[in-house]
Amino acid sequence: KYGTQEALIEAVADVDAMIIRSDKATKEVIDAAKNLKVIVRAGAGYDNIDLQACTDRGVVAMNTPGQNSNAVAELAFGMMVYMARNFYNGKSGHELKGRKIGVHAYGNVGQNVGRIAKGFGMEVYAFDPFMTDEQIKAAGAIPMHTAEEMYSACDYISLHIPATDKTKNSINYELLSRMPKGGVLVNTARKEVINEAELVKLMAERPDFKYIADIAPDNAAEFAQFEGRYFFTPKKMGAQTAEANIKPGSAGAKHIVAYLQDGWNRFQVNK
């Protein structure tokens, strides 16, 4: 990771290809890379790349989906157990076995969540508008046809939707208020998909509702009033394992070689 945008801009001046992890590939960075042909995000999310700037320059932008999916799924369950057992404070908690979990977006991470959930003896439901019922069933979950239907039925909701113009702030009061008593929202996606003000409103109204995430919200201090009902990791932690740090970078390098040699662009995310 470069310390400043200026350092990154200087570093990319003569490159033909870039792999980025947490740095931001802004328009300024992309325009500074005069020879740039392809940029790859080492991970599934790509909201730190200015896709329009890439398109304007004729640069192909790709991601590396699935490379850190197990790491994210394992962290989701680590946080779920931590919350279910009251932060290991010695007081009785509850078991996950027999509970219903709804997986919002059933891609690589979501399917790993489903796999682990079955090991805990949970009932696994999934909503994904880009998958058919048959695909969801084949991947081991019970398909739900709307988000509203799934949120109304499940004790746990695990979020895996990307942050797009359509999904930002989409996890709102109307949707979350449908969850049963004792509902737990698990966010290892992006904080931008949560309507934070409406989540705070719901938690203030419902002392049974809990929220856990691998990134702190913008206004973390507002959650102090909900002691014992929320948990955030100090930084974005889903992909922070040795394995997940190696695999996306390796996949990104392979993407670049394949694109430069053969024009391969299976995981292109810009138009």
For the regions a protein language model found, what residue spans apply to each?
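Phosphate/diphosphate ligand-binding glycine-rich loop within oxidoreductases
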Residues: 16-93, 195
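Rossmann-like adenosine-cofactor binding region
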Residues: 26-31, 131-225
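Rossmann-like dinucleotide-binding domain for NAD(H)/NADP(H)
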Residues: 61, 75, 173, 181-271
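Oxidoreductase and adenylate-handling cofactor-binding alpha/beta cores
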Residues: 73-89, 118-122, 250-264
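Glycine-rich NAD(P)-binding loop of Rossmann-like domains
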Residues: 83-119
